[in-house]
């Protein structure tokens, strides 16, 4: 059986990269939450 997670860096950045997050209000809120929490990595 084929596994569900097939890693692909291009898809990863197109779907959950920083620039994509900044496009929507919800995405910007997510980045701000992660900043407030002190995450080392904010997005893919």
UniProtKB/Swiss-Prot annotation:
PANTHER family: LARGE RIBOSOMAL SUBUNIT PROTEIN BL34M, MITOCHONDRIAL RIBOSOMAL PROTEIN 34 FAMILY MEMBER. It comes from the Bacteria. The gene is rpmH. Coiled coil: none annotated. InterPro entries: Ribosomal_bL34, Ribosomal_bL34_CS. GO terms for biological process: translation. Residues 1-26 are annotated as: Disordered. The lineage of its organism: Bacteria, Bacillati, Actinomycetota, Actinomycetes, Bifidobacteriales. One of its GO terms (molecular function) is structural constituent of ribosome. One of its GO terms (cellular component) is ribosome. This is Large ribosomal subunit protein bL34.
């Amino acid at each position: 059986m084929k596994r569900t997670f097939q890693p692909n860096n291009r898809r990863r950045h197109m779907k959950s990269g920083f620039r994509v997050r900044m496009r929507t209000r919800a995405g910007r809120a997510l980045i701000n939450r992660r900043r407030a929490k002190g995450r080392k990595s904010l997005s893919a």
